[in-house]
Amino acid sequence: MDNKIIKKVGVILRPSSPQLKSGYEKLEKIFSSYSIEVLIEDKSAKMIGASGASFKKICNECDFLVSFGGDGTLISTVRKSFDYDIPILGIHAGNLGFLADLSLDELDSFVEKITQNRYKIDERAVLEATVIKNEKEIKMYAFNDVVLTRTRVSNMIHIETLVNSRSFNTYYGDGVVVSTPTGSTAYNLSAGGPVLFPMSNVFALTPICPHSLTQRPVVLPGKFTIEMKTSEERALIIIDGQDVHELELGESVHIKLATKTVKLMHKEEYNYFDVLKEKLRWGE
């Protein structure tokens, strides 16, 4: 997007949040003051009583997307826009997020800098999970994480894991989190996994409540592929905490970093470690 003139942006609002109407009106006014047209996605528009455009239309016509809400809204926006390779700006609706790190009060200054080509774009890794069902290949993409877990809360699960087609480990516990660097501060962190720098070319494999103190998180190079399967019962594959798929006995899921990436827009002075310190309250 170097030296590209920004003419049009698409906006997605946090679902079930009609109180964001006034914030959206302020946002639209700011962009319009710099001669930038704003399109709002259909569902968001309906929520606040405005007219909108289809998600496909705004992805095809706009220079970037604006996710207005929180990290969950941004993740949903990322997942819907995977195939369009369009940058996304996250604006939080009150609380600083790991991903939605710009406030509405900062938007005017940010848009002015956009017109001067003064902003930053990070490229973030995405996980690709593949399952073969009825001789059909099903691909799923995760921005944060892929979780393999049990179908019943009262049971533990055995997960056989291979790395680059070689036997690696068998996890016995509540499941396994496979996390991107971006997702390392989400479920992965809660499960005791490491914080990964978001632009690094690696991913993490973290057991959830393992029934052994020797089962520890592992960080793997981005070019590696892991395969996971269960030998005793069905399992659930959960993508970014939003989509759930069943893994039947005899089936396996292959997970690796995808060739596609996600582009996130930030302020010129954005520093990931400043956000990390504030969110995790380090140094307090």
Swiss-Prot record:
GO terms for biological process: NAD metabolic process; NADP biosynthetic process. HAMAP family: NAD_kinase (MF_00361). This is NAD kinase. Belongs to the NAD kinase family. GO terms for molecular function: ATP binding; metal ion binding; NAD binding; NAD+ kinase activity. NAD(+) binds at D71, G72, N144, D145, D174, T185, A186, Y187, N188, L189, S190, Q242. It comes from the Bacteria. It comes from Sulfurimonas denitrificans (strain ATCC 33889 / DSM 1251) (Thiomicrospira denitrificans (strain ATCC 33889 / DSM 1251)). It is found in: Cytoplasm. One of its GO terms (cellular component) is cytoplasm. Its cofactor is a divalent metal cation. Its EC number is 2.7.1.23. Signal peptide: none annotated. The gene is nadK. The active site is at D71. Involved in the regulation of the intracellular balance of NAD and NADP, and is a key enzyme in the biosynthesis of NADP. Catalyzes specifically the phosphorylation on 2'-hydroxyl of the adenosine moiety of NAD to yield NADP.
